[in-house]
Amino acid sequence: YLIEDHSDDSRVGIYYYEYGSYPRKPRVVYDRKHSSINHIEISDVPETMFYNTRLFHTSGITLGLGGNAQKFAIECIKKFKEHGTLISFDVNYRANLWSGEEARACIEQILPYVDIFFCSEDTARLTFGKTGTIEEIQKSFCEDYPISVVASTERTVITPKKHNFTSIIYSAKEDKYFREEPYNNIDVVDRIGSGDAYVSGALYGYLKYKDCQKALEYGNAMAAIKHSVIGDMVSTDLEEIKGIIAEHQNTGYHSEMN
């Protein structure tokens, strides 16, 4: 569904990204004040959407906007959950939107409704005060809340233009961890959006196959290929992703051309 804002002063939120190069880190500046998302109401959403949706996904960025955007996201989570929709949530913590204490207090309110939870190890430790190994951290979220699946990306930055990427997924139902070998020495054109690409791939794999290993493979492949694309949206298709997964799993000869 696409919900449009027809008000005279409607606008879309903007962010400005300044690329970094060692030793200077990249910077993001948000310009979201008075954007349409801050004025949306639950009544703007067609009622049929709550009955016909397999999965609802949102993130800590929306909650971090505060005010009406936060209220709307929480209302959506609760209403979708009432109608049996799977709830997916990515913490996606941004320190220039809110403090760690504010994020934790808000997110812990919605975790009882979440089925699929995306949270990095660093965020789990710094924002939620978790300790132990990443496996213990993931399992603890499922022990504290009725979460079914926890996914955490793992990135090693060799240089700003050379990264390794993989992830680990925990299934509470199976009490099992899923991993694969990392995508090593990724030539980074632009890393912005790789986290969202991972989430989209993981959710596709999970919904399509009902399999956490497939979720892991599609998530990792989507994130890896996103690094090769300028901008915050990945440009690819299903066949290319399947090919990347197959090549990643093949330890033999790799062709340089398709």
Name every feature range the model reports, one short phrase each.
Residues 34, 121-122, 196:
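Alpha-helix N-cap/helix-start capping motif
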Residues 8-12, 126, 158, 186-187:
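A short acidic, often aromatic-flanked loop/helix-cap motif at beta-alpha or helix-coil junctions
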Residues 1-60, 241-258:
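Conserved N-terminal subdomain of the carbohydrate kinase-like
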Residues 13, 42-44, 100-104, 134-135, ...:
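Structural motif corresponding to alpha-helix initiation and N-cap regions
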Residues 55, 61-166:
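Conserved beta-alpha-beta core of the PfkB/ribokinase-like small-molecule kinase fold
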Residues 19-23, 104-107, 133, 167-169, ...:
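Short, hinge-like loop/turn segments at secondary-structure boundaries
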Residues 78, 134-258:
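Conserved phosphate-binding/catalytic region of the ribokinase-like
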Residues 46, 107, 188:
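Acidic, amphipathic alpha-helical patches
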